[in-house]
């Protein structure tokens, strides 16, 4: 391990951290103050903030491996993680709204979670997202103004100074795409020519109005991925009060009545309980979090009874409200090959499908290599080209997570249900139309020879949209915040009706945010940690 916050002592820190964690793992306690399930974009934040108090003992449990792999650390190699042991590899059910297609639903597995396998884009979400969360929870601490304060606190911004929106003293190294590709610059020029406003960065004024275009903000430091695990947990891996377990599965939460008292884990083939004297925090993502809740007896009583799981708390919203950004890629062939730079995704665009909208409902992420679906690949994939990963930022369709059985080793049933709402199909048509206008504009002519997918001259119909649809892997919403009957947690992220159990990950978001989701998940982690430190006077 290398403490990136103190490069001068890298060797000494590495030795201390490795020795410390080896000792912690070899001498596991039977009880910790706090147990955090999942070392992803939210769980890493919670673990760091709690462990900053030396009086707290913190156990951070991760199902996947460590992050010491070139496929993780080299920004250009992120696609190499998909379909490996660093990917949960979920598969959605066949969807009648996609002509029976069953989409792959990748999710990061390992230290850093999604922030160790994604394209490293830092996107805060739109003002309207956070104000919606405040309205849903009745708590102004979730509104845009409050969250902006947290963003400034956590960022170590490396771009042009902007004190109104950016912070420079936090743990998260955020930088503009360094030396971006000419094709990324062409996207900015093309969008601006079509009337889309251009901004210096995408995480300030651009996310307060109708949208815009900018070079992406990225979590890349000195040419290496700067995951949220590396930002928050890695620099404190030598703390004696922090234990990090990898390749350890949390099978269920343990209860005494309606109080969470620990977890049951499986590690190296052995199953054992570990107690939490204060709280258990679930941060396992929008597919695994509802799975873990239901396996533990928290969910819809009828569903649990069907599987023979004793009911601890009836919460019918567990697993409901599944949302994800859905994309419809269009691909162009290069005149001459252009090698991807950084992560291969350096420019981002948010816009609206209808003139009357006051916030963007479309999301465009440029990918500097071809990314077709398995269906649209049949149209012909160029050897050298780029794809506009054009999608719905605010989909109306909702899916669901269900248990297949009471066996923790079984994958859950993922009913993604994309494009089930007719409004999404209407927005998708506008999305693909704008995508093609941009890619076929004057700005791209020096670089592009032809549109290959869907193909020059082809009229866009609903069949193409259903064939092209793929997921951004931004699953959210399956344990949402709020006070209605379908809410799972309150504004403090505590599970309704349960003591000592909190959720901190993208599953608590009432709706998916506008843009990539790792930054909002970091905010969820910061909010959870703030609330816990206040409650326990840490």
Where do the language-model regions lie?
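N-terminal redox-cofactor-binding region of secreted/periplasmic oxidoreductases
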Residues: 1-538
């Amino acid at each position: 391990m290398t403490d990136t916050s103190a490069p001068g002592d890298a060797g000494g820190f590495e030795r201390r951290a490795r020795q410390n964690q080896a000792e912690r793992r070899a001498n596991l306690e039977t009880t910790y103050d706090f147990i955090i399930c999942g070392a992803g974009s939210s769980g890493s934040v919670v673990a760091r903030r709690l462990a900053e108090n030396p009086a707290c003992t913190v156990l951070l449990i991760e199902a996947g491996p460590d992050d010491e792999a070139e496929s993780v650390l080299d920004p250009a190699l992120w696609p190499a993680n998909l379909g490996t042991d660093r990917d949960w590899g979920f598969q959605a059910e066949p969807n009648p709204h996609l002509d029976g297609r069953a989409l792959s639903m990748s999710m990061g597995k390992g230290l850093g979670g999604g922030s160790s396998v994604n394209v490293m884009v830092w996107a805060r979400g739109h003002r309207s997202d956070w104000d919606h969360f405040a309205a849903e929870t009745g708590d102004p601490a979730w509104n845009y103004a409050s969250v902006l304060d947290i963003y400034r606190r956590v960022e170590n911004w490396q771009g042009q100074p902007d004190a109104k929106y950016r912070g420079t003293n936090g743990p998260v190294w955020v930088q503009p795409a360094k030396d971006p590709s000419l094709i990324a610059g062409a996207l900015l020029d093309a969008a601006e020519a079509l009337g889309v406003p251009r901004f210096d960065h995408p995480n300030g004024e651009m996310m307060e109005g109708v949208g815009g275009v900018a070079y992406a903000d990225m979590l890349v430091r000195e040419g290496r991925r700067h995951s949220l695990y590396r930002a928050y947990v890695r620099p404190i891996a030598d703390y004696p009060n922090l234990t990090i377990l990898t390749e350890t599965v949390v099978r269920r939460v343990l209860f005494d009545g309606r109080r969470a008292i620990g977890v049951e884990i499986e590690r190296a083939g052995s199953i054992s309980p570990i107690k939490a004297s204060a709280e258990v925090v679930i941060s396992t993502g929008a597919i695994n979090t509802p799975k873990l809740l239901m396996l533990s007896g928290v969910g819809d009583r009828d569903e649990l009874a069907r599987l023979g799981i004793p009911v601890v708390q009836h919460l019918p919203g567990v697993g409901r409200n599944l949302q994800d950004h859905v994309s419809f890629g269009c691909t162009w062939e290069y005149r001459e090959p252009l090698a991807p730079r950084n992560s291969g995704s350096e420019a981002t665009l948010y816009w609206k499908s209808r003139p009357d909208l006051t916030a963007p409902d479309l999301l465009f992420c440029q990918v500097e290599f071809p990314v077709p679906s398995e269906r649209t690949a049949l149209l012909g994939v160029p050897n050298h080209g780029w794809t506009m990963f054009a999608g719905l930022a605010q989909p109306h369709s909702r899916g669901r997570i269900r248990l297949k059985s009471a066996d923790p080793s079984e994958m859950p049933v993922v009913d993604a249900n994309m494009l089930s709402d007719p409004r999404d199909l209407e927005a998708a048509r506008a999305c693909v139309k704008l995508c093609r206008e941009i890619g076929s504009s004057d700005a791209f002519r020096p670089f592009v020879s032809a549109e290959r997918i869907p193909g020059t001259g082809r009229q866009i119909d609903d069949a193409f949209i259903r064939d092209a649809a793929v997921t951004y892997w931004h699953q959210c919403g399956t344990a949402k915040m709020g006070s209605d009957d379908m809410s799972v947690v309150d504004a403090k992220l505590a599970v309704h009706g349960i003591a000592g159990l909190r959720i901190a990950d993208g599953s608590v978001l009432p709706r998916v945010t506008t843009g990539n989701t790792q930054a909002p998940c970091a905010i969820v982690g910061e909010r959870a940690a703030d609330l816990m430190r206040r409650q326990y006077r840490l």
